[in-house]
Amino acid sequence: ISIVTETRNFHAIGVRLGRHDATITLFDLSSKVLAEEHYPLPERTQQTLEHALLNAIAQFIDSYQRKLRELIAISVILPGLVDPDSGKIHYMPHIQVENWGLVEALEERFKVTCFVGHDIRSLALAEHYFGASQDCEDSILVRVHRGTGAGIISNGRIFIGRNGNVGEIGHIQVEPLGERCHCGNFGCLETIAANAAIEQRVLNLLKQGYQSRVPLDDCTIKTICKAANKGDSLASEVIEYVGRHLGKTIAIAINLFNPQKIVIAGEITEADKVLLPAIESCINTQALKAFRTNLPVVRSELDHRSAIGAFALVKRAMLNGILLQHLLEN
C-alpha cells in the first residue's frame, strides 16, 4: 500500500532554542516555512526559561492562527545533553538544569505530540532528509559555532547510542599544551575551532601589529571570512589553521565511522574556499586511504535555517509511524 502524506492541511512548529533567544518556525509537512519569529529569552533559570519559552510559543500560535490549520507537533532543539526518549534535558551550557522535563511541559500546555533533540544532531538529520547528504545513508556533520560538535548519521538514522549523546568532537584534544577548555581539559578542538576562539586569535595578531583587512574594532567571524575570501593573508592563515585542526579531528571520525560524506556547518563556511582545502589536506594524510577515497567534504545546505533540525524530528516521527498514525486516525 502506498501512502502519500497530505502536506497542506497539517502543520508543525519547530523551535531552535539558543543561549539567549528562540527561533520559532511554522512548517507544513513538506518542510515549507510558513512563518518565523525570533524571541529574546534572557532568562537564567530552568523555571523562568520554561515559562518564557512556553509563553513565546503560545504568542507565536496566536499571531499566526489564521495560517494554522491542524497543529500536529511541536519540536524543540537545543545545545546540551538531551534524552530524546524521555524528553528530558540534563545539561545546557548556559543555565543549570536538572532533569528538565520539557516534552512533558509542552504536551501539557499545547495538547499535541512534542519532541526534543540536540541541535547539531538534529541538523545532521535535516541534511540527510532535505540537504547536502540526501544522497547517502552514512554521513558526519561538523558544526563550528559557539562550540564545535558533530552529528553522525548511520544507515539513515541519528547515531546516539544507549546514553543518548555522542558526537562531542569539540572535546577531542588537539593541542596537549593548549588553552584550558570550559570542560576542564586542555587543548580541546573547541579552544581553536569555535567562533570566539577564531575571533580572539585574529584580534591578538592584530594587536601584535600584523596587517589585515580585518578592522580591530570589527573583528568578527563574518569580517574574518570576508577578508579571507579576498585573499587577506592573516585571515586566510587563521582559517587554514582552524581547518587543519578540524581536519585532524574529522580524520579520526572517518577512521571510526567510514562515512560517505562530510558536511561542514557554521559561519566559518563562508570562507569555504580556504577552509575546505585545509580540512581535506589533513584527511588525505591522516585517514585510511580506503575510507577517504571519493569522500566529499561539502558545506551545509541548511545552516541558515535555524529550526530545520527541529522539523527533521517531526519528519522522522512521520516516517517511523508515530505521527502517521495520528494523521490516519484523523
Predicted regions and their residues:
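Glycine/GP-enriched mid-protein hinge/lid loop-to-helix segment characteristic of carbohydrate kinases
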Residues: 36-38, 44-49, 98, 105-226, ...
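Glycine-rich phosphate-binding loop and adjoining helix at the ATP-binding site
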Residues: 33-138, 274-285
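ATP-binding/phosphotransfer module of carbohydrate and carboxylate kinases, centering on a glycine-rich
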Residues: 2-70, 177, 189-330
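Short, acidic, Ser/Thr-enriched surface-loop or helix-capping motifs
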Residues: 28, 84, 153
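Solvent-exposed beta-strand sheet faces enriched in polar/charged residues
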Residues: 77, 117, 143, 265, ...
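Short glycine-aspartate micro-motif
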Residues: 2, 12-16, 71-75, 139-143, ...
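Short glycine-rich anion-binding loops that position phosphate/pyrophosphate groups of nucleotides
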Residues: 79-82, 146-147, 268
